[in-house]
Amino acid sequence: MAPPLNVVLVNSKSDEPFNDEHRRLIAKISPLCYAYNYHLVLVNFRIDDSPTDFAREMATSTSIGKGGERLIELAKKGKIKITKLPLSEDLGKIVICTSKPDKTKSENPKNIFALSKKRKIALIFGCDKKRNKNIRNLLQKADYHLDISCKGIQLSVDAEMGAVTSIINNLE
C-alpha cells in the first residue's frame, strides 16, 4: 500500500483573516482529496476550530462536494490537518507545485508519482501567486519543484490543484 499523499494549501499571509476566497479554494480541493484518497493540510489559515468543526461550519456555506459533505467525511476520517508554518517533517518529501521551478529541484509528474508510491509526499500549493518570505522559504527548503504544465505556464490555483492531483492519481 502506498504511503499517504498530502495536498497542502498554504496561506502565505499569516496575518490575513480567513475569507471567502480561502473558503472557495478549500471547497474546491476537498472533493479531489476525497476522490483520490488524499489528505488535506491547511497551513497558516486563521482557523481555531478542530478539523471536524471547521468542516461542519464550511459545509453550510458551499454547494461544492455534495454541499460540503466530502469535506466533513475527510475530517471524520482524520484526513484534514490544520497547522502553521514551518511545515512538519511528518508531511513527507516536500513538492512545491509552481510554474517557475528551480531547475536544480525540478521533477516531472512521472517521477513524483513514482516517489509517491515509496514515500510520503506533500504537494504544496500557495493560495495566491505572491512570493513573500514564507513562500520563498518553502521554495528553498522544498525537496522538489513540479511544473505540471512542463512548459512554465501559470495556471489558476484551483486549476493547478485539479491537474496535479488528477495526473498524479492516474499515472501508472
Region locations from a protein language model:
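Long, charge-patterned amphipathic alpha-helical coiled-coil/hairpin "stalk" segments used as oligomerization
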Residues: 98-138
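RNA substrate-binding interface of SAM-dependent RNA methyltransferases
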Residues: 2-99, 169
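Structured adenosyl-cofactor binding patch, chiefly the S-adenosyl-L-methionine
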Residues: 133-172
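Short acidic, S/G/P-rich loop/turn micro-motifs used as interaction or catalytic elements
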Residues: 13-16, 47-50, 101-104, 128-132, ...
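Short, aromatic/basic amphipathic alpha-helical patches
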Residues: 53-62, 110, 134-139
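Short, well-ordered alpha-helix to beta-strand connector turns
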Residues: 37, 91-92, 119, 139-142
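Well-ordered, non-membrane alpha-helical segments in soluble/globular domains
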Residues: 22-28, 106-110, 161
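Short, Lys/Arg-enriched, disordered terminal segments
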Residues: 1-4, 112-113, 117-118, 172
